[in-house]
């Protein structure tokens, strides 16, 4: 989410460009901040789906879980980019303060019993057991 915009800044280090894209980063960060909810493991977007795979629940393919690593990874990345942009541009405010509090509270990446990153909030059986994620 906005990563391609921020990567252009990282490549060029053009502060004028960063100033131009900052409102986009900020509004996306605000949206994601408002979507986060408390779970027993931390903050997450609830519910969520994996964009490419489903898991089995009582033999049925299910696309929706409590939360997904894909969603949380995107938000973690966005929040880090936004906070870095705030520092570069010397823009601190209520939202950056909220994001600073929320970022470390987002559910950490979970590993399964076989060492793989869990796609969902639990170690479910995947519909596509040979799916390409590691």
Predicted feature descriptions by range:
Residues 27-85:
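Acidic/histidine-rich catalytic neighborhood
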């Amino acid at each position: 989410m906005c990563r391609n915009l921020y990567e252009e800044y990282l490549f060029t280090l053009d502060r004028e460009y960063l100033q131009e894209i900052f409102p986009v980063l900020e509004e996306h960060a605000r949206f994601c901040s408002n979507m986060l909810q408390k779970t027993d493991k931390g903050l997450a977007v609830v519910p969520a789906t994996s964009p490419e795979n489903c898991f089995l629940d009582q033999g049925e393919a299910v696309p929706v879980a409590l939360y997904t690593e894909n969603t949380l990874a995107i938000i973690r990345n966005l929040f880090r980019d936004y906070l870095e942009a705030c520092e570069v541009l010397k823009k601190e405010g209520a939202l950056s303060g909220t994001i600073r509090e929320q970022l470390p509270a987002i559910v950490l990446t979970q590993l399964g019993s076989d060492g793989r990153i869990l796609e969902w909030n639990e170690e479910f059986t995947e519909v596509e057991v040979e799916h390409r994620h590691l």
